[in-house]
Amino acid sequence: ENLLAGPSENDPNLFVALYDFVASGDNTLSITKGEKLRVLGYNHNGEWCEAQTKNGQGWVPSNYITPVNSLEKHSWYHGPVSRNAAEYLLSSGINGSFLVRESESSPGQRSISLRYEGRVYHYRINTASDGKLYVSPESRFNTLAELVHHHSTVADGLITTLHYPAPKRNKPTVYGVSPNYDKWEMERTDITMKHKLGGGQYGEVYEGVWKKYSLTVAVKTLKEDTMEVEEFLKEAAVMKEIKHPNLVQLLGVCTREPPFYIITEFMTYGNLLDYLRECNRQEVNAVVLLYMATQISSAMEYLEKKNFIHRDLAARNCLVGENHLVKVADFGLSRLMTGDTYTAHAGTKFPIKWTAPESLAYNKFSIKSDVWAFGVLLWEIATYGMSPYPGIDLSQVYELLEKDYRMERPEGCPEKVYELMRACWQWNPSDRPAFAEIH
């Protein structure tokens, strides 16, 4: 019996692959972008589904597939994407390259973003009272696919025809390495340690390989006695709770006996600070910088919703992957907030130039102190990784801030971005914007 045959476009269990996926044991199944598959069921947390293709049966990541009649199957449909992320995705410079996106702030509201002669134009897709869709009122369509097809043959109100769908962004993160894998605790022998990537406050970070899955990973180790074991385990516990495309994903821990390990996904290009300092500025231009900042604010909005504070947000604690993907890392100081503020215990070391005044003065932390740090991080991005408060001694920073001194607008930084920095640097925490507003 051919389960994939027949006119079953409306079959709710028929899906199509959005990306290639290569099986890595544990009954996983390789799929190719565009291939049809039938979903038979999901694992305990819904992150993997059992599927059947013409090549066999096995497990695939749920976020790599989409129902066969959904919009996601179209190469031009990018789902919820912000305006400046759309401009980044269309930065290749080809006339007629385009994408269709859903508004992040108003779900259901869609737009076409279209590049022509060095500019990106945005057109709202309207819905008429009879449910038909249009950009220009004279041409109305039953479906989005029909509308896109029409405007690919005639401009009809657009600056040019829709010609080249913009490539989709990176493949999504596979949460968890296999469908059966719910044990965070790993054997140290599962990991081959390679070279050292850097040192953190509490220990070293290494590149390693998870042998079973031939997967490159980052391994954070705990220096003996530098940090309470309890604190290290708290960091791992925080990371287990967190799943967002712009937050570094925890894969496992080794906590039975020292040396302790936290194992996370590996990010190819290392920390954002070094990346900004060494990058080619022609390639990492204003559009890319804004796209990076948007990804960080998206991650922070998620932490805000979850009542987490990061407490050490800075370019050195963000990591860079392929295609300018940025993820916030280093939850070493982060805390789940039960009240609105958290008081750090005496003797905690703070990175002074990123720390909000109320945290420096009273050890008080809240999501609004993360907003202050985000303002400093924006300044780091705008200056390609300069050290904040250039020429100012650490001991003078608080006093100057108290007297209303704030860093000046970096050269080439758009006025609107600088206004956002200044809003993040309001003395009174309640006057600072929330990440939900920033993003």
Curated annotation (Swiss-Prot):
Protein source organism: Feline sarcoma virus (strain Hardy-Zuckerman 2)
Protein's UniProt name: Tyrosine-protein kinase transforming protein Abl
Lineage: Viruses, Riboviria, Pararnavirae, Artverviricota, Revtraviricetes
UniProt-annotated binding residues for ATP: 197-205, 220, 265-271
UniProt entry keywords in alphabetical sequence: ATP-binding, Kinase, Nucleotide-binding, Oncogene, SH2 domain, SH3 domain, Transferase, Tyrosine-protein kinase
Name of the gene encoding the protein in the UniProt record: ABL
A single MF term (Gene Ontology): non-membrane spanning protein tyrosine kinase activity
Entry-linked InterPro entries: ABL_SH2, Kinase-like_dom_sf, Non-receptor_tyrosine_kinases, Prot_kinase_dom, Protein_kinase_ATP_BS, Ser-Thr/Tyr_kinase_cat_dom, SH2, SH2_dom_sf
Miscellaneous comment text of the record: This protein is synthesized as a Gag-Abl-Pol polyprotein.
Pfam families given in the database record: PK_Tyr_Ser-Thr, SH2, SH3_1
Enzyme class: transferase
